[in-house]
Amino acid sequence: VALINNQLLPYPYYAKPGAVRSPAQILQWQVLPNTVPAKSCQAQPTTMARHPHPRLSFMAIPPKKNQDKTDIPTTNTIATVESTITPTTEAIEDTVAALEASSEVTESAPETNTDQVTSTVVE
């Protein structure tokens, strides 16, 4: 008695070798006595248990390994950004109101100082 255990079968089968049996009994299969057959097999006679055939929609077919591939060249689409240092000259005016520290009330024009400041701006 040989045990047939296939991943497609809902439960394992025992098969008796055909050399021991008569030609009329060679094609007979016996179900394990301690298992419950699947519902699709219960309506069939117990002398002949058939293998359930999975539908093609459940079968996975792997793709061919030697498929024609179009090689797409890889290009670097990210441009390198170089920083440019641009000197910028800004005029900063400092307005200081000059107040005279005298007891007299006088009006004086505010003094304006202009300084040149150079800064670097990275663009």
From Swiss-Prot:
Keyword hit for Phosphoprotein: yes
Tissue specificity note: Mammary gland specific. Secreted in milk.
Record protein name field: Kappa-casein
Functional note: Kappa-casein stabilizes micelle formation, preventing casein precipitation in milk.
GO biological process: lactation; protein stabilization
Segments for region (Disordered): 100-123
Bias (Polar residues) ranges: 103-123
A cellular component term, taken from the record's GO annotations: extracellular space
Keywords annotated in UniProt: Glycoprotein, Milk protein, Phosphoprotein, Secreted
Glycosylation sites: 74, 84, 86, 89, 95, 102, 118
Source organism per UniProt: Capreolus capreolus (European roe deer)
InterPro entries: Casein_kappa
Location of the protein in the cell: Secreted
Modification Phosphoserine occurs at: 102, 119
Family affiliation: Belongs to the kappa-casein family.
Site (Cleavage): 58-59
